[in-house]
């Protein structure tokens, strides 16, 4: 480089030398001239060679005034590693040096003259001459204008760290925002601006904090911004000269982002050289106690234009100190903000930041604006876009300070808790892209929100959660029982007078908050309006303790039984603090006593706020004196006033509640808290009036006549103490074997409300539970003679006495009972008498049948909906029954067709055919029809067509042939039955010949062979009926009812081979003990107050398979205890070839049985033979894959010890898969028999078989 000549003509030359043009790589002679006294501006000229310049033979090839450059930068590309680029308004001019030293010397010389051209005098030149760090932003542009505003020319715009000329491509935001073409990408310490060629104002100013990621590919560079950017989320794609430039842009921008992150730590950008930045991380804030936040000082909103000071940088250099900006766009490194003592190195803004800030802050900062600027941004935006009204408006709306204005709207932390005069204060929101701290971010935008938006303080993070435990009302609690935060987070404790989130700093807000309970939760925590100063008084230990307190107390704010039931109408229900709505919440916990020993006021006077919506249908919670206001449907088995016991399970019968407060759901029975409750059971009398439970609560044994559950809900309970259908949608799922507290059938809702539809819990059952009334079964007979889901178990509103607490869901064991039970005066339990007024009602209308809960009589696997539960009756069968009703003038019994099931279940129906079936006018009627419930006359049942894969064993007393004769329906007998084999027909059962795969094995006394022998096509299933003709037609109904309640219905299927043996052993079908003592369950104790319920027995032809426990049903013992226990295993009973019933005394486990020990417990006839009776007839069914037996155990009440089992006559097993067309109709058949569409083995006791 030639030395500048000393002659007068070259006095203004500062530097000369040969440099290359980047594109052509031609060397040219460049001359750098300073501003001359003659008025020539500082400029860079080049000549073709030095000779021409020295001889002045020609004008310079090109002259570039430095004042027209808005930026000068070092550059490098793939061809030239040492470039110096001058960016003017309309072009990009670069020179290439041969070495880095040469590049730097030229760069510094250009930078110095450029700064002078911007208005500096020689005295201030030292400011910009000191550091050439690769960026001229510190010493160029408007930054120094504040130091000396005498220069009259307006520089083109703010200086930038880096400037690249790019071509924005029509992709992403470039297309949507119409940013296409040649732009300059101008980088400052905090922003990136796109300045269109030949324009002074930035089209878009993006904060570095708005950049999600950036990267380059080949000669393309892209920037992805988030939704906090003024442009919204998207990408900018730009093309540059080559990949080197793109890489340089990527690295430089990434470095700027990293530097900003390191300095202010608002978020951590990508710390590696990857092409994307890290996601935003919320920083902790530095609190400066000496400077109150704007929430206390007051925030006067200043317009963004004020912070920009003008629409053009000219105003910043206009020489008016009064227009000094709180943070100029070049705040910290511009001419205005940089003190003369600072070297102005563009690469060391952070070192100058504190000094510059303190230098100007005290002297020239406007006090009202004091809160607005907490950080002097060392390289804050200085883009020409300072004048862009678009960027202003967008920044003001976005709250992220995306304009060239250095007021970052997001940097609200300064206004929140920062010290504006503290240069070292770090505002995490300074960069405004932290998406999670909108509370403070918008504060600078909307100062009026200061009173309502909690300052975001890192120390307060522990206390930013609302206390989830509502304390009981006490000296520390609000009127509605919410916590009074023991830790104030702000160092003060809340009192009921001050709403949550209020603080001394917000006294005005306090009043309204205290007035309205909703305001208690309007703010998330106390910190919502609290002054940071108070907050700072809180030690970290306070925060941690507070957080622990608020998290550990998750318990209700009331004593378990305390408080009036309903929610206070005056108080809104807080969504945060529940009262007891769940059993475990009702446990006796006293958080306040535990916490501070404070006494809670009388719980009865407390108004607890139940935060839960009542789930019961159509029932509004009513304030009452109930001990809890739980709105949940109790799932416990049975509760006499159980709502209270469930809410506070510990109070009564804690043994019924597990440690978590849940009601025990075990099938062993007695789950409900009211077990053992007698007529005087206090629980039955303490039903909360405000209970919104839809509960199946019935009173314990004897409680019927003593107490009526009082429910405020209109149709909750009838006078009988039974809940009315509207009371609940839930059904008690626990099979309570200990049914001494079972209540009368809730199906029968009492005289005042007989027509109620079944309780909604009925509709929540599987179809299999939607039982229909059994034909010909009187209500009492149904209740006493058929095992059913008892209301005692809370499962279904079935007619169930204490005896009928069987929770067996076996289809036929469930079936056969009327909802309304008629009790005889002879019934042992006094509570039965309560139902007597209701008993006489007839079940003669379809409406009643529909309104009552029909009970299933089958367990079928065919239905995917309830594979383990009995199927509900189908509508089509209802229609068929209605048609049959019309034909036979009988009450239509709606029995949907039995499912086509693979035959996985045994239908064990425990009922006893009583002589009462034939008693009274029923015996005299020619057609069996249920005219009154008192007459135990089975209604006709129409057999469905289709193959049935079930074997039904109907164990019940046989009916007289007269019945079948009276029905006039031909009874088909399968094959040649042995002489005397009595096929006991089902009452008026029209069996279509297409019924196929069905074989009735009628095992009855020879005398009872009144079955019509019309041969039908061979069936693959055996209808095995061991008929025991019930001759005791004249038995009094009282006796019958009593026997029914005490009868144990369990039968061991006996094959035709063992018919004689079975007949010989009265112990099998009710021996000397009286009422049938047969039990198909584990050690059924036949006690008078217990019934038996059926269990599913699987008979696997290939072998005994044990059924899943879900297919077993708990049994309730029957009345009489039988001495002989006959292990009745399905394997033994109907395994492979047939069933074996042995009356062995031993306890034997049969794996094929779906329960542990299936006991056939006949009468205590010690001489009962042990030999198994082979059920040959079952083989036909087994051939067809019959796995289960449907046992219809119809019990005969008046079984005398001398009575012996009928001699079953085994019909020959028919070929499998062949329909049984026997249209057998006997009105004497039990309704359970009526509903069995698959092979039924009826063990019926014939009166002739009495011994």
From Swiss-Prot:
What sequence ranges are listed for the domain IRS-type PTB? 160-264
Q: Where is the composition biased (Basic residues)?
A: 354-363
The UniProt annotation puts motif YXXM motif 7 at 950-953
Q: From the UniProt record, which GO molecular function terms apply?
A: insulin receptor binding; insulin-like growth factor receptor binding; phosphatidylinositol 3-kinase binding; SH2 domain binding
Q: What GO biological process term is on the record, naming one?
A: insulin receptor signaling pathway
At which residues is Phosphotyrosine found?
465, 612, 632, 662, 905, 950, 998, 1188, 1238
Domain named PH: residues: 12-115
Sequence motif: YXXM motif 6, positions: 730-733
| Record has Lipid metabolism as a keyword | no
State how it assembles: Interacts with UBTF and PIK3CA. Interacts (via phosphorylated YXXM motifs) with PIK3R1. Interacts with ROCK1 and FER. Interacts (via PH domain) with PHIP. Interacts with GRB2. Interacts with SOCS7. Interacts (via IRS-type PTB domain) with IGF1R and INSR (via the tyrosine-phosphorylated NPXY motif). Interacts with ALK. Interacts with EIF2AK2/PKR. Interacts with GKAP1. Interacts with DGKZ in the absence of insulin; insulin stimulation decreases this interaction. Found in a ternary complex with DGKZ and PIP5K1A in the absence of insulin stimulation.
What is the role of this chain? Signaling adapter protein that participates in the signal transduction from two prominent receptor tyrosine kinases, insulin receptor/INSR and insulin-like growth factor I receptor/IGF1R. Plays therefore an important role in development, growth, glucose homeostasis as well as lipid metabolism. Upon phosphorylation by the insulin receptor, functions as a signaling scaffold that propagates insulin action through binding to SH2 domain-containing proteins including the p85 regulatory subunit of PI3K, NCK1, NCK2, GRB2 or SHP2.
Would you tell me the protein name for this molecule? Insulin receptor substrate 1
**From what organism does this protein derive?**
Chlorocebus aethiops
Chain's gene name:
IRS1
């Amino acid at each position: 480089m030639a030395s500048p000549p000393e002659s007068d003509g070259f006095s203004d030359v500062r530097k000369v030398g040969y440099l290359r043009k980047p594109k052509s790589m031609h060397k040219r002679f460049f001359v750098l001239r300073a501003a001359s006294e003659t008025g020539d501006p500082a400029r860079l000229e080049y000549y073709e060679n030095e000779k021409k310049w020295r001889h002045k033979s020609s004008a310079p090839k090109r002259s570039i005034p430095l004042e027209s450059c808005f930026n000068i930068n070092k550059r490098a590309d793939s061809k030239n590693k040492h470039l110096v680029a001058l960016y003017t308004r309309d072009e990009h001019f670069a020179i290439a040096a041969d070495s880095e030293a040469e590049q730097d010397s030229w760069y510094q010389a250009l930078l110095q003259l450029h700064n002078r051209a911007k208005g500096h005098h020689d005295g201030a030149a030292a400011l910009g001459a000191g550091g050439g760090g690769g960026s001229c932003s510190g010493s160029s542009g408007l930054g120094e204008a504040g130091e000396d505003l005498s220069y009259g020319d307006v520089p083109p715009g703010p200086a930038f760290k880096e400037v690249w000329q790019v071509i924005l491509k029509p992709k992403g935001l470039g297309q949507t925002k119409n940013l296409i073409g040649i732009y300059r990408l101008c980088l400052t310490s905090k922003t990136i601006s796109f300045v269109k060629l030949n324009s002074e104002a930035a089209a878009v100013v993006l904060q570095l904090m708005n950049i999600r990621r950036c990267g380059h590919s080949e000669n393309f560079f892209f920037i992805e911004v988030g939704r906090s950017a003024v442009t919204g989320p998207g990408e900018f794609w730009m093309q540059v000269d080559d990949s080197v430039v793109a890489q340089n842009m990527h690295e430089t921008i990434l470095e700027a982002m990293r530097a900003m992150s390191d300095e202010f730590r608002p978020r951590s950008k990508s710390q590696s050289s990857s092409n994307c930045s890290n996601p935003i991380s919320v920083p902790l804030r530095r609190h400066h106690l000496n400077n109150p936040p704007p929430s206390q000082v007051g925030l006067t909103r200043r317009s963004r234009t004020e912070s920009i000071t003008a629409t053009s940088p000219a105003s910043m250099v206009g020489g008016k100190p009064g227009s000094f900006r709180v943070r100029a766009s070049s705040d910290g490194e511009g001419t205005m903000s940089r003190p003369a003592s600072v070297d102005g190195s563009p690469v060391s803004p952070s070192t100058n930041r504190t000094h510059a800030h303190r230098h100007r802050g005290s002297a020239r900062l406007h006090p009202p604006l004091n809160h607005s600027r907490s950080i002097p941004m060392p390289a804050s935006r200085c883009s020409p876009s300072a004048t862009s009204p678009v960027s202003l408006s967008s920044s003001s709306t976005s709250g992220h300070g995306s304009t060239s204005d250095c007021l970052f709207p997001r940097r609200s932390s300064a206004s929140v808790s920062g010290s504006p005069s503290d240069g070292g204060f770090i505002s995490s929101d300074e960069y405004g892209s932290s998406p999670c701290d909108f509370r403070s971010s918008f504060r600078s935008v909307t100062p009026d929100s200061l009173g309502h938006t909690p300052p975001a303080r890192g120390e307060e993070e522990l206390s930013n959660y609302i206390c989830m435990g509502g304390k009981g009302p006490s000296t520390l609690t609000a009127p509605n029982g919410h916590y009074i935060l023991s830790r104030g987070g702000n160092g003060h404790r809340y009192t009921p007078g001050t709403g949550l989130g209020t603080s001394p700093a917000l006294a005005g807000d306090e009043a309204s908050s205290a007035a309205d309970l909703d305001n208690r939760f309007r703010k998330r925590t106390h910190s919502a309006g609290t002054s940071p100063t108070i907050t700072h008084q809180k030690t970290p230990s306070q925060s941690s303790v507070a957080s622990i307190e608020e998290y550990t107390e998750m318990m209700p704010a009331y004593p378990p039984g305390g408080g009036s039931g309903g929610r206070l109408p005056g108080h809104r229900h807080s969504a945060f603090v529940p009262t007891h709505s769940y059993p475990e919440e009702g446990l006796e916990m006293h958080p306040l006593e535990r916490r501070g020993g404070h006494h809670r006021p009388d719980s009865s006077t407390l108004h607890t706020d139940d935060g839960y919506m009542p789930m019961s249908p159509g029932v509004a919670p009513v304030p009452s004196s109930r001990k809890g206001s739980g709105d949940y449907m109790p799932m416990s088995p049975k509760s006499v006033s159980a709502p209270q016991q469930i809410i506070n399970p510990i109070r009564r019968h804690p043994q019924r509640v597990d440690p978590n407060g849940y009601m025990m759901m075990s099938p062993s029975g007695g789950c409900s808290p009211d077990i053992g409750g007698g007529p005087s059971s206090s629980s039955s009398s303490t039903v909360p009036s405000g209970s919104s439970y839809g509960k199946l609560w019935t009173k314990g044994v004897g409680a019927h006549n003593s107490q009526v559950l009082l429910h405020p809900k209109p149709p909750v309970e009838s006078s009988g103490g039974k809940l009315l259908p509207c009371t609940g949608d839930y059904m008690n799922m626990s099979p309570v074997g200990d049914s001494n507290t079972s209540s009368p059938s809730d199906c029968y809702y009492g005289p005042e409300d007989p027509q109620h539809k079944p309780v909604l819990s009925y509709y929540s059952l599987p179809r299999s539970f939607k039982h229909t009334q059994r034909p010909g079964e009187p209500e009492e007979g149904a209740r006493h003679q058929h095992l059913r889901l008892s209301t005692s178990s809370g499962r279904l509103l079935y007619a169930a006495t204490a005896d009928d607490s069987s929770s067996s869901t076996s289809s036929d064991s469930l079936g056969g009972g009327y909802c309304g039970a008629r009790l005889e005066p002879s019934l042992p339990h006094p509570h039965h008498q309560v139902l007597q007024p209701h008993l006489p009602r007839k079940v003669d209308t379809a409406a009643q049948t529909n309104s009552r809960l029909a009970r299933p009589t089958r367990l079928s696997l065919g239905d995917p909906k309830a594979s383990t539960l009995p199927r509900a009756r189908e509508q089509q069968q209802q229609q068929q029954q209605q048609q049959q009703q019309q034909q036979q003038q009988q009450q239509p019994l709606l029995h949907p067709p039995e499912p086509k099931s693979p035959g996985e279940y045994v239908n064990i129906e425990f009922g006893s055919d009583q002589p009462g079936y034939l008693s009274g006018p029923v015996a005299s009627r020619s057609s069996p029809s249920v005219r009154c419930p008192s007459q135990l006359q089975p209604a006709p049942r129409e057999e469905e067509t289709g193959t049935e894969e079930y074997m039904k064993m109907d164990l019940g007393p046989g009916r007289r042939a007269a019945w079948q004769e009276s029905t006039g329906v031909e009874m088909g007998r399968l094959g040649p039955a042995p002489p005397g084999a009595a096929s006991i027909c089902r009452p008026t059962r029209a069996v279509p010949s297409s019924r196929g795969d069905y074989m009735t094995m009628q095992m009855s006394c020879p005398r009872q062979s009144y079955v019509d022998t019309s041969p039908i096509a061979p069936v693959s299933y055996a209808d095995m009926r061991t008929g025991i003709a019930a001759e005791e037609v004249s038995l009094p109904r009282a006796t019958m009812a009593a026997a029914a309640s005490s009868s144990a219905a369990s039968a061991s299927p006996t094959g035709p081979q063992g018919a004689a043996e079975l007949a010989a052993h009265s112990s099998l079908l009710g021996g000397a003990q009286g009422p049938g003592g047969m039990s198909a369950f584990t050690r059924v104790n036949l006690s008078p107050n217990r019934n038996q319920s059926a269990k599913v027995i699987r008979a696997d032809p290939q072998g005994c398979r044990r059924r899943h426990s879900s297919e077993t049903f708990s049994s309730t013992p029957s009345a009489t205890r039988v001495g002989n226990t006959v292990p009745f295993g399905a394997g033994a009973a109907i395994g492979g070839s047939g069933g074996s019933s042995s009356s062995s005394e031993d306890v034997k486990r049969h794996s094929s049985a779906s329960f542990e020990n299936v006991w056939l417990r006949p009468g205590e006839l010690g001489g009962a033979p042990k030999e198994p009776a082979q059920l040959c007839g079952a083989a036909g069914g087994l051939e067809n894959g019959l796995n289960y037996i449907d046992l219809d155990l119809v019990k005969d009440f008046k079984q005398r010890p001398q009575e012996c089992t009928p001699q079953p006559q085994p019909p020959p097993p028919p070929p499998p898969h062949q329909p049984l067309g026997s249209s057998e109709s006997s009105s004497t058949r039990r309704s359970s028999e009526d509903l069995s569409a698959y092979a039924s083995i009826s063990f019926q006791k014939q009166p002739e078989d009495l011994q």
